[in-house]
Amino acid sequence: MVSYGKYKSQYEMMTQKPVPALIVQLGLPTMVSMFVTSIYNMADSYFVGQINTSASGATGVVLGLMAILQAVGFMFGHGSGSIISRKLGQKDIDSARKIAATGFYAALIAGFFFLIFGGLLVTPLMRLLGSTDTILPYARAYAICILCAAPALVSSCVMNNILRYEGRAFFAMIGLTSGGVLNIFLDMLFMQKLNMGILGAGLATAISQYVSWALLLTMFILKKTQTSLAPKYINFNISTLGDIITTGLPSLARQGLASISTMLLNNAAGVYGDAAIAAMSIVNRISMFIFSAVLGIGQGFQPIAGFNYGAKKYTRVRQGFFFTLIFGTLLLGIASFIVFLSAGNCIQFFRDDPEVIRIGIPALHAQCIALFFVPFQVCNNMMFQSIGYKFNATFLSSLRNGLCFIPVLLVFSFVFKLAGIQTAQAVADVMTSLICIPFTIKFFAKLPKE
């Protein structure tokens, strides 16, 4: 039985420190991590974009593969982290350690599964994700490197989220940002100095993932955490593993549908050539960079929601939700406004192709307008998953990239052609936020007042 007294100060910080200050404290390191991750994703797009338009399109195709890997990683990561934060809020450290070890090793096994079977089926997988004949050679080379990094990528998602849900976002930031900075350096080395082409971008990403993985693992080895990844805590029974998976289903739904929507988007855009695929890929990466601001703050709110819900401090859950919503909307509003005004320059930075720029500008404008609606849906998703409302979290997480986006994309691309493809995500964002409203009202009406 692990003594609670050793971790008393961490518990008191999570349940007593003023909520706005705590969200900023936990959210800023996460936001920095998200920004760096987005920057190195955009760095790949920038350096690959110097090759040609087909290579630039390949980054959009492989983005679908990375979404699949992240879907599984986040399922185990958010599933484990959400349960851990509530267990720690209840001062049950033993159970938290069992969840942490089980989630980590399950993710590691899943990563090796992707490495083996993904490597064997890489060509049909790239075609399924929307690759054209001209994009395929670039996509295959890039994807093979990503698949080699699958064990690290998937299990890193678990370690990162365990650290965040414990309230140790700074340690998570060290691992992720170090890997991100290294990725950018290796991109320059492999692609500009050694002229390795898109293979260099893939190798840079793979090496960086393993370095990040090693740094995150070091935090657990050095016992900087309340939880442990020691094999003795593994508990692969149906109850434990099932609880992790069902709690993490919203993340699997969100990221899995992101992969499917990327595949459908690439296939729809492919009708208009490689330039359209490249343009939409660039727009998505820019949007994700802006989106990382509110996502970082939202992830800072997650451990606070889980800890305090477990400790029955419901007023702090309320305060956290509304502070995150207001702060996130302000951040995203400012960032979206700046990008809206400089849309052409932003796209040109990644690929100086008139056709790519022409297609990308309207899509980026639409995204910037719709991003004002995103903080509300993010706050809902983060809160419901953190407190164990599995149905609400899974359903709402499925909307933005799936239940709303996919039908809108299919209908709009048929009716409005290219313009429909350019605006589909923006329309889906507005729809998603509107659907979230009744869930939010019902939850806070029933939440005890303490």
Identify the role of each PLM range.
Residues M1-G27, I84-P151, K193-L249, A305-A370, ...:
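Short alpha-helical transmembrane segments in multi-pass integral membrane proteins
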Residues M14-Y46, Q50-I51, A67-G79, I83, ...:
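N-terminal transmembrane alpha-helices
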Residues V24, I39-Y40, F76, F117-L121, ...:
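Residue-level signal for transmembrane alpha-helical positions in Major Facilitator Superfamily
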Residues V24-D44, C145, G179, S208-S212, ...:
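Transmembrane helical elements of multi-pass membrane transporters/channels
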Residues T30, M34, Y46, L63, ...:
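Transmembrane alpha-helix boundary and packing residues in multipass membrane permease domains
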Residues F35, I39-G57, M126-D133, L189-M196, ...:
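Helix-terminus/linker motif at the lipid-water interface of multi-pass membrane proteins
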Residues S56-I116, L153-A172, N266, A279-A343, ...:
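Small-residue-rich hydrophobic transmembrane alpha-helices
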Residues G77, I146-R164, A172-G180, A201-A214, ...:
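Short runs within selected transmembrane alpha-helices of multi-pass transporters and secretion channels
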